[in-house]
Amino acid sequence: MKPLMLQGHQRAITQIKYNREGDLIFSSAKDSKPSVWYSLNGERLGTFNGHIGAVWCVDVDWTTTRLITGAGDMNTFLWDVETGTALGKIPCNSSVRTCNFSFSGNQASYSTDRAMNHPCELFVIDVRNIDASISSADPVLKLTMNEQQSKITSMLWGALDETVITGHENGSLRIWDLRAVKELNSVNDHTASITDMQMSSDGTMFVSSSKDCSAKLFDSDSLMCLKTFKTERPVNSACISPLFEHVALGGGQDAMEVTTTSTQAGKFDSRFFHLVYEEEFARVKGHFGPINSMAFHPDGKSFATGGEDGFVRLQVFDSSYYEHTFE
């Protein structure tokens, strides 16, 4: 299982996303230049230049024609994937923490941090025809989080673009009805900040990772907790295999606490759990720091990890992975 190392970012990776076909990987990092790579051979296609701060989030739409990024420079950018040109720039009041396209690709959502006397806010915008006027256009929807709800740290679109699921700093998960503009449900299964949420390929459930050293599987409609995957250290990212009943977890300590730990200590492994039995069955070493983001290839035959060390690693599963059975 020889990995491809994608070296191009100078700073820590914050998020990685595959497009729908899985031929491209989009990565964002703290060095202000989101990049796009070929997933087959690890060649860098190019960068999207325009941000002047750490880019916290990246997402690509269903047709791989548009990209959305949000950064610490208090801007959300929309890009043309093919040419790398910026289609629109939306200024915000504080740094942009999450951004997502809806399934239809007609709308996008992004959320801002609670900072400088500005509350945490969630915006939904129409992205059907983007031009320079988008910077001053009103959002379709704006939700403001109060003190109890705490700031949004990750976000997903629910079924049929009717709902948005948010993960918060206090560990709560909330589902919002976008038509009635109200909160439908909230659960507090996690006890610490949510770090990442990723949907299963059919959209019926999602996995959330948290600093409380666990990842949990939730029903994406009722927010019922279905499974819990426990580890000894904070989980920064988790993803569900589209091929098998497997969940991959990545993490490590907080970046601040990593000083002189060797990779052999096993703190920065990708860990594989069985979705149903909640049992760990494999680990993959590699990064020289915590894993910040993970994603399965849409065909389930490989996966990518982005770490605090600035590398994106692509790992293709060998034959023993497909032959593995649980007793």
Curated annotation (Swiss-Prot):
SMART domains: WD40
Keywords annotated in UniProt: Cytoplasm, Initiation factor, Protein biosynthesis, Repeat, WD repeat
SUPFAM superfamilies (alphabetical): WD40 repeat-like (SSF50978)
Organism domain of life: Eukaryota
Keyword Glycoprotein found: no
Extent of the WD repeats: 8-47, 50-89, 147-186, 189-228, 286-327
Disulfide cross-links: none
Pfam families: EIF3I
Annotated Gene Ontology cellular component terms: eukaryotic 43S preinitiation complex; eukaryotic 48S preinitiation complex; eukaryotic translation initiation factor 3 complex, eIF3m
GO MF terms held by the record: RNA binding; translation initiation factor activity
Gene Ontology biological process terms from the UniProt entry: cytoplasmic translational initiation; formation of cytoplasmic translation initiation complex
Protein localization: Cytoplasm
Function, as annotated: Component of the eukaryotic translation initiation factor 3 (eIF-3) complex, which is involved in protein synthesis of a specialized repertoire of mRNAs and, together with other initiation factors, stimulates binding of mRNA and methionyl-tRNAi to the 40S ribosome. The eIF-3 complex specifically targets and initiates translation of a subset of mRNAs involved in cell proliferation.
Subunit relationships: Component of the eukaryotic translation initiation factor 3 (eIF-3) complex.
Family designation: Belongs to the eIF-3 subunit I family.
Protein known as: Eukaryotic translation initiation factor 3 subunit I
Source organism (scientific name): Anopheles gambiae (African malaria mosquito)
